[in-house]
UniProtKB/Swiss-Prot annotation:
Coiled coil: none annotated. It comes from Corynebacterium kroppenstedtii (strain DSM 44385 / JCM 11950 / CIP 105744 / CCUG 35717). Disulfide bonds: none annotated. The keyword Protein biosynthesis applies. This is Elongation factor Ts. The gene is tsf. NCBIfam families: tsf. CDD domains: UBA_EF-Ts (cd14275). Associates with the EF-Tu.GDP complex and induces the exchange of GDP to GTP. It remains bound to the aminoacyl-tRNA.EF-Tu.GTP complex up to the GTP hydrolysis stage on the ribosome. GO terms for cellular component: cytoplasm. Pfam families: EF_TS. PROSITE patterns: EF_TS_2 (PS01127). It is found in: Cytoplasm.
Length: 275
């Protein structure tokens, strides 16, 4: 008897992009364990696992003020385009920066014209006739912060926001940090440096790399070198300083920062509708 449901198969397909039969087989092999089924599909070559899992259904915008970034959600992009909606979000972002908001709870409580942001949001929501949500907020430490806001189209507000904290002086440093922010927006780095990646995630990636190599029939003697190569590929994908720079593909982000005399100390990335 199957120890999974049709809903499990559907969810696995949505997350991985794999076919129905592949998802069924993965759940069978994993004895119904969803996380193990995802790993099974990764070993078998599913490419979008994890990236699809980050998506949620939402419209809205990203707003930044000072060292603080917020996400405000709406039900439709029609409201997201509304100039009043953007003005409201900017006002909340300014209040959030003053309060150093670092969570949805912090954001809901910040003072907007003498009113908690959540109450101000509900009043604005009633005015425009659509449900709105203060989804999240984050504040980054640092005296120097480069900001990049990406618009998916000219008539829509920013859907991606990045803040990069850095140490460095002068126009060259500012330009380098701004390029780093654009890099984060485009290539979605998750960590600043290799040491920031949690050890359990590294070991999980190592295990998957080894299992994938065996699945492909690689020689046992060559496995250690192949696994390390794949692990380095993983780091290049998720670690900002190790990524090839979008500004100069022949150099890593770290090399370009070193040339500009810049030390990156942290970053935050928000995208509307993603976790």
């Amino acid at each position: 008897m199957a120890n999974y449901t049709a809903a499990d198969v559907k969810k696995l397909r949505e997350i991985t992009g794999a076919g129905m039969m592949s998802c069924k087989k993965a759940l069978e092999e994993a004895d119904g364990d969803f996380d193990k089924a995802v790993e099974f599909l990764r070993i078998k070559g599913a490419k979008d696992v994890g990236k699809r899992a980050e998506r949620t259904a939402a419209e809205g915008l990203i707003a930044v003020s000072g060292n603080t970034m917020i996400e405000v959600n709406s039900e439709t992009d029609f409201v997201a385009k509304n100039a009043e909606f953007k003005e409201f979000a900017d006002k909340v972002a300014k209040a959030a920066d003053e309060a150093k908001a670092n969570s949805a709870e912090d954001l809901a409580a910040v003072n907007v014209d003498g009113t908690p942001a959540e109450e101000a949001l509900q009043a604005f929501s009633a005015k425009i006739g659509e449900k709105l949500a203060l989804r999240r907020a984050t504040t980054i430490d640092g005296d120097n912060v480069a900001v990049y806001l990406h618009h998916r189209s000219a008539d829509l507000p920013p859907a991606v926001g990045v803040m990069v904290a850095y140490e460095g002086e002068g126009d060259a440093a500012k330009e380098a940090a701004h390029n780093a922010a654009m890099q984060v927006a485009a290539l979605k780095a998750k960590y600043l440096k290799r040491e920031d990646v949690p050890s359990d995630i590294v070991e999980k990636e190592r295990s998957i790399a080894e299992a994938t190599s065996r699945e492909e029939g690689k020689p046992e003697k060559a496995l250690p070198k192949i696994v390390e190569g794949r692990l380095n590929g993983f780091f290049k994908d998720v670690v900002l300083l190790e990524q090839p720079s979008v500004a100069d593909h022949k150099k890593t982000v770290k090399q370009l920062m070193d040339e500009a005399g810049v030390t990156l100390t942290g970053f935050r990335r928000y995208e509307v509708g993603q976790q």
